[in-house]
Every structure is written in C-alpha cells, then in structure tokens.
Regions:
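Bacterial Sec-dependent N-terminal signal peptides
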Residues: 1-23
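Acidic, histidine-bearing metal-coordination/catalytic regions of metal-dependent phosphoesterases
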Residues: 18-148, 167-168
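Active-site neighborhood of divalent metal-dependent phosphoester/pyrophosphate hydrolases
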Residues: 141-194
Length: 194
C-alpha cells in the first residue's frame, strides 16, 4: 500500500511539473541606451518571468570560467515580473566589447508582496551558440558612423533594402527612429510588422 501511495504521489507531482508553462525568449534581445559605461538589454518572454543579464568581458575566456556579474530588472529593490524585460548594465569600460547572456525564471504564482513562486530558469544558450555582444561607446574615437531608419510603415522590403549593406559597412550603430508601423493594434503586429 505504501508503495502504491508513493507511486501515486510521484505521478501527481510529475503531472503538475509537466503541466507548468515553460518560459522562453519570445522576441529579442535588443540593445538600447548604449553609452560609454553601459547598455540596456530589452526582450520579451512567453510567460511572466523575473529576469537578469549575466555579463563577461570579450577576452576569449569561457563564459563560465569565473562568476559573472548579474544585473537585474528591479524597482526600489524588488525584481520586476512581467513579459517585457529591460535590464540596465552599468559600470563598464568605454570602447569595450562585452558578452552577455539573458536569463529569465518563469513565475508560477504571483501574490504580490505576500508570495511569489518561481519556476524553472532559462537562458540564451551560450554552449551551442556564441553569446550576444555589446560594445560601449568610445568618446576618444575620431569619428562615429551610424545609420538612421524611419518611416518604414511595415514595408519589410524597404527595411531590408535600407539595411542591405549594414553587415559589410559595420556602422557603429543603427537607430530606429520611429514610424516603423502605421498603426499598432496588437503585440503580434509590432513584432511581425517588419
């Protein structure tokens, strides 16, 4: 009888665990507000999550050769929970390239200040793919090349044409200046509009 009860409890726990939604990156990451000492990473997830960014210098070392600093999306000391994540990374050296990994932990239960239950953690896969990189601005640089794109109004063909040579030219940054869509009625339209 004890064996039967143990098996039933194990199966129930397994069923509950399997039934939990899995947190994954839905869109992004995108870099914003790049300065000489930092940058902001923005992305969305498939479910509500708590998030953070792990940063390492681009020095050829294994990403996990040492404990890497973690930067959190927080407000007055409390980690924000949601599907849209904005993590500011600061205190970096000017004109330096950094590798980063985005991480999120799914929220299974959110009762505000009473209780928050976090589920599995998931991050960008740096073992199978190269980590994302960001380079801080260098004020000592003689010149900066940037491209500005705007008034696309969901015309993907124009967008692709304007950015056709970017990979070869390697501008320091590309700025999306607005009017990427004529109107926005849904989140889906924002990400699939171009």
């Amino acid at each position: 009888m004890k064996r039967l009860i143990s098996i039933l409890v194990a199966l129930s726990a397994w069923g509950i665990a399997i039934g939990q939604p899995s947190v994954r990156i839905a869109h992004g990451p995108y870099l914003q507000q790049v300065t000489d000492d930092g940058f902001t990473v923005v992305w969305t997830t498939t479910i509500n999550a708590a998030s953070w960014v792990e940063v390492a210098p681009d020095d050829g070392s294994h990403f996990y050769a040492a404990e890497r600093p973690k930067y959190y999306d927080s407000h007055i000391g409390k980690r924000r929970i949601g599907r849209l994540h904005r993590v500011r990374v600061e205190g970096l050296a000017p004109g330096t390239t950094y590798r980063y990994r985005i991480m999120q932990q799914g929220v299974l239960c959110d009762e505000g200040n009473k209780r928050v239950v976090l589920g599995e953690s998931y991050g960008s896969d740096i073992l199978k793919h190269m980590p994302y990189t960001a380079t801080t601005l260098d004020e000592k640089k003689d010149q900066t090349e940037f491209w500005v794109v705007n008034d696309i109004h969901a015309q993907d063909s124009i967008f692709r044409l304007l950015l056709e040579g970017a990979e070869k030219a390697k501008p320091d940054f590309v700025c999306f200046n607005g009017d990427m869509l004529t109107s926005m009625e849904s989140e889906k339209q924002l990400f699939e509009g171009y």
